[in-house]
């Protein structure tokens, strides 16, 4: 015995040695993923009580998965080595435009917020599977020199969400509060006749602890 693993320890070729798969390079499943994201904003005071702010949030992702099964593995059982690559690219971003106005008139406080936002997502995927990798040390790299292509696939997913919102906050002496909100949201993933929805709202408040009794 030279210490090497006997791939078929019996006369039955279908009964392979599971320990063969611990040999480095015979079976590979490798994933690399990189992601860059951030949140950027700028704010400008247009006049007394009036401000404009823009928020931008980009999110970029790239990943690669490679799989390789050599001849001496339980999946292949002495046949032709196989390899698969899966490459994915994603770019998502959110942008918000916000206008706010706050003003006090003696005992009255008024706040107005206007918002427009959009979220966009773009996802791409490319896959390829081959049979008959000529040199096992190349694993899932250079799959173009394999003896045959088993499958090629691609995928593209894109969607957009858009929103508009207006909100008014009012209070009198901090005692009596009123908030009125109107929002309109739309999504490209909904049907042609149901892409948009309207969401109004009204809230009343009373700060009892501000009363004199």
Name every feature range the model reports, one short phrase each:
Residues 1-22, 67-82, 124-152:
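Surface-exposed loop/turn segments flanking beta-strands in extracellular/periplasmic regions
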Residues 48, 106-108, 174, 200, ...:
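Short coil turns and loop connectors of transmembrane beta-barrels in diderm outer membranes
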Residues 96-100, 201-211:
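Short, well-ordered amphipathic alpha-helices
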């Amino acid at each position: 015995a030279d210490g090497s693993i006997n791939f078929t320890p019996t006369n039955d070729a279908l009964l392979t040695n599971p320990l063969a798969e611990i040999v480095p390079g015979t079976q590979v499943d490798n994933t690399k993923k990189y992601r860059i994201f951030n949140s950027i904003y700028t704010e400008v005071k247009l006049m007394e009580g009036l401000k404009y702010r823009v928020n931008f949030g980009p999110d970029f992702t790239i990943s690669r998965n490679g799989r390789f099964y050599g001849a001496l593995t339980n999946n292949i059982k002495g046949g032709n080595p196989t390899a698969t690559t899966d490459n994915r690219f994603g770019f998502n971003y959110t942008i918000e435009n916000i206008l706010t106005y706050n003003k006090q008139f003696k005992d009255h406080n008024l706040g107005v917020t206007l918002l427009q936002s959009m979220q966009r997502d773009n996802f791409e995927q490319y896959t390829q599977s081959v049979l008959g990798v000529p040199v096992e040390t190349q694993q899932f790299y250079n799959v173009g020199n394999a003896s045959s292509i088993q499958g090629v696939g691609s995928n593209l997913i894109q969607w957009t969400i858009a929103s508009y919102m207006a909100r008014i906050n009012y209070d009198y002496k901090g005692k009596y509060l009123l908030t009125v909100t109107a929002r309109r949201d739309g999504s490209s993933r909904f049907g042609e006749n149901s892409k948009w929805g309207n969401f109004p709202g009204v809230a009343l408040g009373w700060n009892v602890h501000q009363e004199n009794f």
